[in-house]
Amino acid sequence: MPHLVLDKISIHYDGQPAPAVERVSIDVAGDDFVVLVGRSGCGKTSLLNVAAGLVTPARGSATINGRPITAPGSDRAVVFQNDALFPWLTARENVAFALRLRGVRPAERARRADELLALVKLGDAGDKRIWELSGGMRQRVGLARALAAEPQFLLLDEPLGALDALTRERMQTTLLDLWTASHAGVLMVTHGIEEALVLATRIVVLAPGPGRVVRTFEPGFSRRYAAGEPIRAIKADPAFATARGELTDAIFEGETA
């Protein structure tokens, strides 16, 4: 099974007197959906960037399947809050572009692009240009393009942060469906407490000054969704409210620890 490991990671930025992150360890297996939460400045995105190969840690090691992570690679796909799509292309052409980079033959690109768009529930939007799509639809295209690389791990940096509440909830189901269908491990950053509880197999709570792990949770709600339980029913469960309170307390307690 694929395995991504951040081991005792410390990150220093030039001009900063203190480390941004100090001795943080996180592991993500191929069937994990790991979510990083915590207030701004605790190093969530910095750690994601180490996993992506965009930041080199001052100390510690980052590996994927035992190999050092030194640069971006096709075994990882990154989706940010602000999409990096080509607005002059259609949704299908954006996904097909990623397939072209993989060397997929022209005759197969459109078919495969349509399959990926259908997977993110955009099967009828292939001919629409990106500027015609809503924020939620654009994020779906971004996810489809990321999956075109057939990565072992999806790295998601607040991909739902700019969406309205209803679209955000719909996208949560999309992310869970993709996680189940793609068999890719996920490492995600979010500020949303409910979002973390719904999506994660494991939640890592970080605190600032410098960034460090203060607690981990294994809420189990994503497994319930995978077994067929609707998200609305999960959120209505008193156990979900209890978990939300515990996670909120852990974040606040981490700020004062």
Curated annotation (Swiss-Prot):
Keyword Phosphoprotein recorded: no
SUPFAM superfamilies, per database record: P-loop containing nucleoside triphosphate hydrolases
PROSITE patterns the record matches: ABC_TRANSPORTER_1, ABC_TRANSPORTER_2, TAUB
Keywords: ATP-binding, Cell inner membrane, Cell membrane, Membrane, Nucleotide-binding, Translocase, Transport
Protein species of origin: Mesorhizobium japonicum (strain LMG 29417 / CECT 9101 / MAFF 303099) (Mesorhizobium loti (strain MAFF 303099))
Gene3D superfamilies according to UniProt: P-loop containing nucleotide triphosphate hydrolases
Its biological purpose: Part of the ABC transporter complex TauABC involved in taurine import. Responsible for energy coupling to the transport system.
List of residues binding ATP: G38, R39, S40, G41, C42, G43, K44, T45
Primary subcellular site in the record, as a coarse category: membrane
Annotated catalysed reactions: taurine(out) + ATP + H2O = taurine(in) + ADP + phosphate + H(+)
Annotated SMART domains: AAA (SM00382)
Membrane topology note: Peripheral membrane protein
InterPro entries tied to this protein: AAA+_ATPase, ABC_transporter-like_ATP-bd, ABC_transporter-like_CS, ABC_transporter_ATP-bind, P-loop_NTPase
Subunit structure: The complex is composed of two ATP-binding proteins (TauB), two transmembrane proteins (TauC) and a solute-binding protein (TauA).
Gene: tauB
Organism phylogeny: Bacteria, Pseudomonadati, Pseudomonadota, Alphaproteobacteria, Hyphomicrobiales
EC id: 7.6.2.7
Molecular function (Gene Ontology), one example: ATP binding
Name by which UniProt lists this protein: Taurine import ATP-binding protein TauB
Coiled-coil zones: none
